[in-house]
Amino acid sequence: HYRWLASMAGVGNATMRLKSDDIFYCCLPLYHNNALTVAWGCVLSAGATLAIDRKFSASQFWDRIRHYDATAFTYIGELLRYLLNRDATPHDKSHRVRLITGNGLRPEIWQQFQKRFGIERIYEFYGASESNIGFINAFGVSETAGFSPLPFAIVEFDADSDEPVKNTKGHLIKVKKGGVGLL
């Protein structure tokens, strides 16, 4: 229950800020966290409408968006790349979607997707149902998974041994700011 409340507060209230007249489209299976916790949490926090579809279809996606008159949707992984790889049409911006949220949007297609389909805001996040921390792009900064209000550390990682690096006392070593490591 805490995760639903956190999702309503973090993704719903603080980030997407849906209105009661918004329609949030979801074509993901409800057993997926992005559908059940994120999409549902966002609409519950705003008193908005959740339009649930049976499945994702790249060829029918924008027709389904228009059918439901959606103003927002959630995505995972390569879904946006599949949409972008379809031939452009004069109807690419013929919809009311202004906000989307999800995870796995590749930085190299972020701006292209946003421009082609006329999406005002993309709220990318990073996290997992089994993790104890998450990151969200609450400020709408392009090509980033955002920040976390919770304390965390990134530690050095040895890719050859597939193990975190430890100092002489056996403690993990934090990377310097901007460094690459293990969360």
Regions inferred by a protein language model and the residue ranges of each:
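Conserved beta-loop-beta connector loops within the AMP-binding
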Residues: 154-183
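Gly/Ser/Thr-rich phosphate-binding loop
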Residues: 45-48, 67-76, 84-159, 172
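Glycine- and other small-residue-rich loops at beta-strand/loop junctions that grip anionic moieties
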Residues: 28-29, 53-54, 76, 102-103
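Ca2+-coordinating acidic residues in Ca2+-binding motifs
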Residues: 3
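Short, well-ordered beta-strand segments
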Residues: 23-26, 183
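Conserved AMP-binding/adenylation subdomain of ANL enzymes
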Residues: 6-23, 31-71, 86
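AMP-binding (ANL) adenylation modules
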Residues: 28-32, 174-176
